[in-house]
């Protein structure tokens, strides 16, 4: 079923790309857009994961460079019956994480230094279990290809003003209307597809992630902390590349402009409530978890300690001492 949904979403994005090509260049523009879309789909299948990781300057780690983090992911992957994914760290203050890759055999998970430093080990386990659930559900191929195509569609819409109107239909009113439609429809169309990709998949990944890590409240507590952090700590790379926002466990965009108009993620409170209900049904007490999850905000556990001069954003002087340094 996931493969069918993937094919439908890729087809929808291709039709959107071709439609914009027609608005900008008539039949010729549509055919050029089709060729570009096919090439991008093929390229995205093989390389979109590498592009996203490179975009965020993700650093691959192993058991020697980040022992606790790597072993945690290894144990969770074993719990899920998955091959060991590649493990990455993103030097970014905002707590967040994502998974990518075309299949479980070629998957990667990435967490920010903000996530590893500010969350307890239990909460980190909940987050990484959620990302492995995306891998197991084969959501990662869809998310990475959609991120690539959505970015291209949005860019094409931005270029519409400079490319001019539909020359095949004349440079008059229709050309102007076509250009304006491309400029307006393209970014919103990309956002709508992102919403369709992310919202239902996040609930499924939350449920499966809770099963993988063994405690739904680890993940629910983590979601609350990440959501609060994302509101006050900007992720500049994500702000510059909003087409990748749906890949993260929590929307990394700060809400500037129209970011909150069409959210790429379901409401965090609803996700937390669903996880708490799952915990109650399995007999896990939230009070005991609260005491563990609300451990010191400056975590000095297996991820290392935050230095005294920390506090800037990822472009500033916030530095961490940990196994990835």
Curated annotation (Swiss-Prot):
Membrane topology according to the record: Multi-pass membrane protein
Transmembrane portions of the chain: 20-40, 145-165, 173-193
Residue segments, region Disordered: 286-325
Keyword Coiled coil on entry: no
Enzyme class: hydrolase
Location(s), subcellular: Cell inner membrane
GO cellular component, one term: plasma membrane
Active site: 131
Swiss-Prot/TrEMBL keywords: Cell inner membrane, Cell membrane, Hydrolase, Membrane, Metal-binding, Metalloprotease, Protease, Transmembrane, Transmembrane helix, Zinc
Domain of life: Bacteria
Enzyme Commission no: 3.4.24.-
BP term (GO), one: proteolysis
Cofactor annotation remark: Binds 1 zinc ion per subunit.
Annotated CDD domains: M48B_HtpX_like (cd07336)
Cofactor: Zn(2+)
UniProt biased composition (Low complexity): 306-325
Similarity field: Belongs to the peptidase M48B family.
The protein's name in its UniProt record: Protease HtpX homolog
Lineage start: Bacteria, Pseudomonadati, Pseudomonadota, Alphaproteobacteria, Hyphomicrobiales
């Amino acid at each position: 079923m996931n493969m069918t949904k993937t094919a439908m979403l890729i087809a929808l994005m291709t039709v959107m790309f071709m439609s914009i090509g027609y608005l900008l260049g008539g039949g010729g523009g549509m055919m050029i857009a089709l060729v570009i879309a096919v090439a991008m789909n093929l390229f995205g299948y093989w390389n979109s994961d590498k592009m996203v990781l490179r975009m965020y300057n993700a650093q691959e780690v192993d058991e020697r460079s980040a022992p606790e983090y790597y072993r945690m992911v290894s144990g969770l992957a074993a719990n899920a019956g998955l091959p060991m994914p590649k493990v990455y760290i993103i030097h970014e203050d905002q707590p967040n994480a994502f998974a990518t890759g075309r299949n479980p055999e070629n998957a990667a998970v990435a967490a920010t230094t903000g996530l590893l430093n500010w969350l307890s080990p239990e909460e980190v386990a909940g987050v990484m279990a959620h990302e492995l659930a995306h891998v197991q559900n084969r959501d990662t191929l869809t998310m990475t290809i959609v991120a690539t195509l959505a970015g291209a569609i949005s860019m094409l819409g931005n270029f519409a003003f400079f490319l001019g109107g539909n020359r095949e239909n004349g440079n008059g009113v229709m050309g102007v209307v076509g250009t304006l439609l491309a400029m307006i429809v393209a970014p919103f169309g990309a956002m709508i597809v992102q919403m369709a990709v992310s919202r239902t998949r996040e609930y499924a990944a939350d449920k499966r992630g809770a099963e993988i890590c063994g405690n739904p409240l680890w993940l629910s507590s983590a979601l609350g902390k990440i959501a609060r952090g994302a509101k006050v700590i900007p992720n500049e790379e994500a702000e510059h590349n909003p087409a990748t926002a749906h890949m993260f466990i929590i929307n990394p965009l700060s809400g500037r402009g129209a970011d909150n108009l069409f959210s790429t993620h379901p409401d965090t409170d609803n996700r937390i409530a669903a996880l708490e209900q799952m915990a109650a049904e399995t007999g896990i007490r939230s009070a005991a978890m609260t005491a563990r999850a609300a451990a010191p905000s400056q975590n000095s556990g297996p991820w290392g300690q935050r230095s005294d001069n920390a506090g800037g954003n990822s472009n500033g002087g916030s530095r961490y001492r940990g196994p990835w340094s």
